[in-house]
């Protein structure tokens, strides 16, 4: 069908071929169309504006959408949902293991070398007339078929074309699998666009007038049922430029549901004294649906009821869920939801003050706590309100329909005013000497782009080279991903460094990478086209990309060392090569005996390099050999510059000249300007360590005040808990660039806790009362130790932790079935637990007092013997440090120096012996208790 446009009498643009916009969501999907200068959400025949992304197989029927959703309870093993979590992945993907625990149907491998996933229906259900195994693409196609049917029925015409949205982090395999599903559904997908971009389009930001010449910086915060997707875009004159993306592939509304479910199940087991709760899939689904509905209600009311009839052995599950309880239970997940905001700002180099607008997308952004945390993150900026005037469940689909109109109506001025630009998620480059990664297109480069670098050979008489293309952020190619390889051959032979090979990387608007290599002297050229720019199908996910970047940061020092070693080896080879060439020059006035000695020396150095692995080479030895060669044979090295055509291109090939659309400053030498307020790398490490310390401190103080045997008032418990949670959020949202501000925050926490403790000067806060029995003490001990293990507080061998964990688990289950035993029985059990615990407890690494921390050599972190010494010194420290043994923090030895440099107005006027620890007088603790309880989780208060 030709795509023609007609105009009626009142100049309204009419589209003769409709393009629908589809938001294919984890839990619900939505479809819309742009026509007559506005978008319309297309409802189904019952008026529902969203369609459940669910497919159910029942006898000879395939049910999709709302009909399938009704079958989740009655037919759980044959009802398929959350397919978006599965599509485009492989069976060995770590996220699939997590997903398998959250679904009621079965996933199996197709037993091929690729380990593709198949959805397995219930084989025992003989009423099914369909096959029992389906590919995820087939399930997804059924949802798209239903969407297409609804759209065709609404528009009263066949629908063939669509624009489909996907999360920004979707890799090539997931995008390709989505396209395959659309093909199965009979849809021609004109474009797959990112969900955040679609949301920005729906809000009409392309035509908005911004105060800055550079346009507006917009954050799209998309928190759905299964994923969190945060994108930062710059919008200027209709151009949408993605600056950074972040998020979490497995964090969304469903994660809140499951966390609430777990706490409700703990309460149910405790009420009914159930040792091991083995509920059916049907009961699990009923509870899940009830929790989800209650959670939605809590966005508008303060209390909701979770109720499931005949939940387990005829027992009813009943739980009063309050907004306060939900916020407490999900607090850590809510804080995790804020981290991507900081990540995208850091990645783009912008600050909170640079952001002009924040758009909320996804049903989970309706949660009041999420909205409050986002506003707190942008406190003291121009963001006073969040943009959420459109329905967050529908806004992405609306944007997709707008884009569908734009690309099919090029003649419309409305279409000419908008351009979408994507970015490369990982750096692209080639393998050079010693398997180094030489980056040609850096990560986060806007596409389309084209960049070129000059290279040469590293061996004499070479007439061909293999050009290996990699993607990733590590310095060595073995740590990155191989994208493709091609060969350039037939150029003129010559000494190493003689050929001039120009390698060009070009990525077009569709993300297709083309690499060409051209040897200038012989005019030989070859290339390769890689349609899957981000790698082989099924290989990379967003979590993989995040891991690559994280590993690159963690291994930065190791990578620098390897690069330095490789550079030294390369320079020694170059010097030896230059000397060997010049010895053949007749102008060199040396006797044959001298030449023979020099050749033997050069051969010895080269042989030494060949026989050594790069890991075994010492930097000092390499530097020593390089300096010796440079000093001893300086005249011979200089002489090569006088030779005619041959130039040692090899001497610094990795810093070759750059052509194309690189910045004009590339290749130049400039003085680095460092502002006084900029933190050094050293300070950044200290800030990171101090942040971790503050977070641990807050968590431990919360656990102490919520201890069930403590005598803190409810008012003070709530006051301390709220204050500490506010401090935790501050650590994620602060723009502080000085360690002084972080240490001042620690002092502020200590001052706050001191004020609280003054109220209890004459009270034994943890004094054991008569009603606190050995059974209570045993239960509390197990809960405390269990939470400590979960929080990774014990720095000991895994085998010891496993023994302790098993003992605690067995004891807790034993307690469920032995509620009325003699007190001596509970004491015996308690002694057993304490006996096993003591060996672990005394093996822990204690946290050092900040002001008393001794100087430790920087390399001590790698020395086990020095760790042992540190531990023994710690055991001799103050009673508070020993008894409130916190996890080892990451603050290095210079912290004491930082404290000394603090201005007087920040440092306490009195010497606080334990600046990081909660100020508690241990004389008020129960002297008969061997275990000091410090880590009771919030939900027990």
Swiss-Prot record:
List UniProt keywords, sorted A-Z: ATP-binding, Chaperone, Nucleotide-binding
Please give one Pfam family short name.
Answer: HSP70
Q: Which GO terms describe its molecular function?
A: ATP binding; ATP-dependent protein folding chaperone
Which ranges of the sequence are coiled-coil?
none
Biased region (Acidic residues) positions are: 856-869
Q: Which family does it belong to?
A: Belongs to the heat shock protein 70 family.
Q: Which organism is it from?
A: Acanthamoeba polyphaga mimivirus (APMV)
Question: Cross-referenced CDD domains, in alphabetical order?
Answer: ASKHA_NBD_HSP70_HSPA1-like
Q: Region Disordered: what ranges? A: 851-887
InterPro entries linked to this entry: ATPase_NBD, Heat_shock_70_CS, HSP70_C_sf, HSP70_peptide-bd_sf, Hsp_70_fam
Name used for this protein in its record: Heat shock protein 70 homolog
Q: What does this protein do?
A: Probable chaperone.
Report disulfide bridges, numbered on this chain.
none
SUPFAM superfamilies tied to this protein: Actin-like ATPase domain (SSF53067), Heat shock protein 70kD (HSP70), peptide-binding domain (SSF100920)
């Amino acid at each position: 069908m030709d795509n023609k446009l007609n105009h009626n009498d009142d100049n309204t643009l009419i589209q003769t071929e409709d393009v629908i916009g589809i938001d294919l969501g984890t839990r619900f999907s939505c479809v819309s169309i742009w026509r007559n200068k506005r978008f319309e959400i297309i409802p189904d025949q019952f008026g529902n504006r969203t369609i459940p992304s669910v497919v159910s197989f029942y006898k000879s029927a395939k049910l999709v959408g709302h009909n399938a959703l009704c079958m989740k309870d009655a037919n759980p093993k044959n009802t398929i949902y959350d397919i978006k979590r599965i599509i485009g992945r492989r069976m060995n993907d770590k996220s699939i293991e997590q997903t398998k625990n959250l679904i009621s149907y079965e996933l199996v491998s197709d037993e091929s070398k690729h380990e593709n996933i198949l959805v397995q229906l219930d084989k025992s259900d003989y009423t099914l007339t369909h096959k029992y195994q389906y590919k995820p693409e087939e399930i997804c196609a059924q949802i798209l078929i239903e969407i297409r049917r609804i759209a065709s029925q609404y528009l009263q015409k066949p629908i063939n074309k669509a624009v489909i949205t996907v999360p920004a982090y979707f890799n090539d395999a997931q995008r390709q699998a989505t396209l395959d599903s659309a093909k199965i559904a009979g849809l021609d997908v004109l474009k797959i666009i990112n969900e955040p971009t679609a949301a920005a389009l729906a809000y009409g930001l392309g035509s908005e007038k911004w105060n800055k010449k550079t346009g507006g910086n917009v954050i799209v915060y998309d928190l759905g049922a299964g994923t969190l997707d945060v994108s930062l875009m710059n919008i200027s004159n209709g151009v949408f430029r993605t600056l950074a993306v972040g998020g979490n592939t497995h964090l969304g509304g469903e994660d809140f549901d499951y966390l609430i479910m777990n706490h409700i199940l703990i309460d149910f087991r405790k009420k009914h004294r159930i040792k091991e709760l083995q509920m059916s899939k049907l009961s699990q689904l009923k509870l899940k649906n009830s929790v989800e509905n209650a959670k939605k209600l809590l966005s508008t009311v303060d209390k909701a009821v979770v109720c499931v009839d005949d939940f387990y052995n005829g027992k009813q599950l009943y739980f009063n869920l309050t907004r306060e309880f939900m916020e407490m239970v999900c607090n850590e997940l809510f804080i995790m939801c804020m981290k991507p905001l900081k990540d995208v700002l850091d990645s783009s180099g912008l600050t909170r003050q640079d952001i002009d607008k924040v758009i909320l997308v996804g049903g989970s952004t309706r949660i009041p706590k999420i909205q409050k945390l986002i506003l707190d993150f942008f406190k003291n900026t121009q963001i006073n309100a969040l943009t959420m005037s459109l329905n967050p469940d529908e806004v992405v689909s609306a944007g997709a329909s707008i884009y569908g109109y734009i690309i099919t109506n090029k003649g419309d001025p409305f279409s000419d005013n908008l351009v979408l630009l994507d970015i490369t998620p990982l750096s692209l480059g080639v393998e050079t000497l010693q398997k180094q990664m030489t980056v040609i297109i850096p990560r986060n480069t806007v596409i389309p782009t084209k960049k070129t670098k000059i290279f040469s050979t590293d061996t004499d008489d070479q007439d061909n080279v293999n050009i290996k293309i990699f993607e990733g952020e590590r310095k060595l190619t073995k740590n990155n991903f191989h994208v493709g390889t091609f060969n350039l051959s037939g150029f003129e032979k010559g000494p190493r460094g003689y050929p001039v090979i120009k390698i060009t990387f070009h990525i077009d608007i569709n993300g297709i990478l083309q690499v060409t290599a051209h040897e200038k002297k012989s005019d030989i050229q070859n290339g390769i086209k890689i349609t899957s720019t981000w790698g082989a199908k099924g290989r990379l996910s967003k979590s993989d990309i995040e891991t690559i970047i994280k590993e690159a940061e963690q291994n930065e020092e190791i990578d620098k060392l390897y690069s330095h070693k490789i550079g030294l080896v390369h320079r020694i080879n170059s010097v030896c090569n230059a000397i060997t060439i010049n010895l053949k020059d007749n102008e060199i006035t040396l006797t044959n005996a001298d030449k023979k000695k020099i050749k033997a020396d050069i051969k010895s150095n080269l042989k030494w390099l060949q026989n050594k692995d790069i890991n075994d080479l010492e930097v000092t030895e390499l530097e020593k050999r390089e300096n010796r060669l440079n000093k001893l044979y300086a005249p011979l090295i200089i002489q090569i510059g006088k030779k005619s055509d041959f130039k040692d291109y090899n001497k610094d090939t990795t810093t070759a000249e750059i052509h194309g659309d690189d910045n004009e400053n590339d290749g130049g030498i400039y003085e680095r300007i460092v502002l006084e307020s900029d933190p050094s790398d050293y300070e950044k490490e200290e800030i990171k360590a101090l942040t971790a310390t503050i977070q641990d401190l807050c968590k431990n103080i919360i656990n102490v005040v919520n201890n069930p045997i403590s005598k803190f008032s409810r008012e003070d418990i709530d006051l301390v808990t709220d204050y500490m949670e506010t401090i935790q959020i501050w650590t994620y949202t602060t723009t502080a660039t000085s360690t002084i501000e972080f240490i001042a925050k620690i002092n502020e926490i200590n001052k706050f806790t001191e004020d609280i403790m003054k109220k209890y000067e004459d009270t034994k806060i943890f004094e054991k009362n008569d009603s606190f029995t050995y059974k209570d003490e045993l239960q509390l001990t197990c809960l405390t130790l269990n939470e400590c293990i979960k929080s990774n507080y014990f720095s000991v061998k895994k085998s010891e932790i496993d023994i302790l964990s098993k003992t605690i688990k067995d004891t807790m289950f034993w307690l469920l079935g032995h509620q009325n035993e003699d007190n001596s029985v509970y004491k015996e059990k308690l002694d057993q637990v304490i006996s096993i615990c003591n060996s672990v407890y005394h093996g822990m690494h204690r946290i050092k007092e900040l002001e008393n921390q001794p100087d430790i050599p920087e390399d001590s972190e790698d020395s086990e013997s020095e760790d042992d010494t540190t531990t023994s010194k710690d055991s001799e420290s103050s009673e508070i440090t020993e008894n409130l043994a916190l996890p080892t923090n990451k603050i290095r030895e210079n912290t004491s120096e930082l404290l000394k440099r603090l201005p007087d107005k920040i440092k306490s006027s009195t010497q606080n012996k334990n600046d990081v620890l909660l100020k508690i007088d241990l004389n008020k603790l129960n002297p008969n208790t061997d275990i000091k309880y410090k880590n009771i989780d919030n939900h027990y208060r």
